[in-house]
Amino acid sequence: IRYAQKNMDVVHAVNFQPVSLTGRMGKGEREKYRITVPDCIQRIEEQTNGEVTVDDWFPVPSCMPLTNVIEAFSSKPKYELSIHFACGAGTYIFEDAETKKFVPLTKFCDIQGMLELFEDKAEEIRSGKNKYFTMLEVVRKLKGFVDTKKQPAGLDLAKMFGNILMKRSFESIGSWHVKGLFLGMMHFQDKYNEDLERLQRCDIHYLTPDLRIVPFCAFNVIPEWYRDRIQKKYSITVEEWEQREGVKLEDGLYRGLMRRGAG
């Protein structure tokens, strides 16, 4: 995180993956090596000297009210991060220009109140209220959730959120993202902690050639049922692929490297 702080002109996110334990391990070994999302969050608080606390984090599905109000306003289905609450967490932090200390989003913005507003207004639009007047009301109220005295210099959070809500574009999201540093983590499961409720709410899937949708933590955690069996059934050699497609694999690789600016 400190490395990212020193390079925030090019680094805008740090994502942690608490280790998944594989192979034969006794209970003592598992307890020794096991680290969970709450463990990581606690250690981040300790290692940032309390600049980023455990209270600054939100489970991933907390962003659903924002998705809901944008979906209601646009009348188009949107991608939903509606995964199980235990799958991951995230927060946004900014840097104080004078002290160089981190200022988490929660320190100057009432996120809980803002999310409640989004959910309430999404329901109003769905129930038939004029969506344009409703969204104007949302944008008008955004400033009330931001403590401008604590807000980092050069940041206008209410304006950026308003742009995201009204423009709903990658550019509007990008202008927000480059101003801060996203911290996130997602704990992929293993055979010692596989949770069926988490699998049922998975947001990262594999689509197999036989048109099955398999949750990530089932596909990779139980490979003898899914990954290995599927790959064995459908994999082909490079030579077979080249003959079928009528191209050389190395030619495609070369073109890909050229597009990325390689020599």
Locate each region found by the language model:
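Extended, Lys/Arg-enriched charged tracts that mediate electrostatic binding to polyanionic substrates
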Residues: 67-74
